[in-house]
């Protein structure tokens, strides 16, 4: 009793007891692990000093390694892209606890672009039946958000439950559709008159086009946010370990440790979040686009 009274034993909810002697953290898959591994190891040392336990870092070549690792308890937490994070949540029950802050935001906006002189396209629904350019089938703002919205709002129906059904829905609902390969390529198809619409991000024209080309385009509509990278923890991690890990990672937001974070993925800060708050709505678009989950995982497979 006296130990508690004298504050020698801390019984508050913010208890600093980490009930495991080691944790393993996964990173976004890369082709050449060496470059990222050295940066990840700086984080490893930092977390070891903050938590007082052994921390292992794993830089895989694909997300399946992380998903299986989380499912079977070999990986406790991981930095992830939005799409794979949602798939991991669906398959293993892992939860997002932190979101990356990039240029002051935890998301960017998916936007529909057309030529300034084209007055026939004024809503997302107006793109149905037109010649459209997506970035890629796994592109968040360039495909998942616009196509997912068209499906959830009932403008396009997918008959079936696989990637073939999704591709058939595209063929049935657009005069033509192209996966251009990126923002710039999609915008160039639009500028060249090959398509009526290009899907992408809110800042794609100013980032990839000269001013004289930027003025030839207009944003039709902003469809909604695409969430930033997240930090996920496994469903089996205890509350106390999770809280301590989150607290330690938030220390990276302060000047003295911030370079550890910015060197990893260019994020300025990590902010607390939940799966539902950060990815929830975006996740529903992945779910309705049949067969897309495997495409998303394949896209990030750097071993192939």
Language-model-derived ranges and their functions:
Residues 2-27, 31-38, 42, 232-304:
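An extracytoplasmic/periplasmic, membrane-proximal ligand-sensing/linker region
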Residues 64-78, 91-92, 125, 169-171, ...:
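Short helices/loops that flank or line small-molecule/ion binding pockets
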Residues 101-160:
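A conserved helix-loop-strand patch within extracytoplasmic ligand-binding domains
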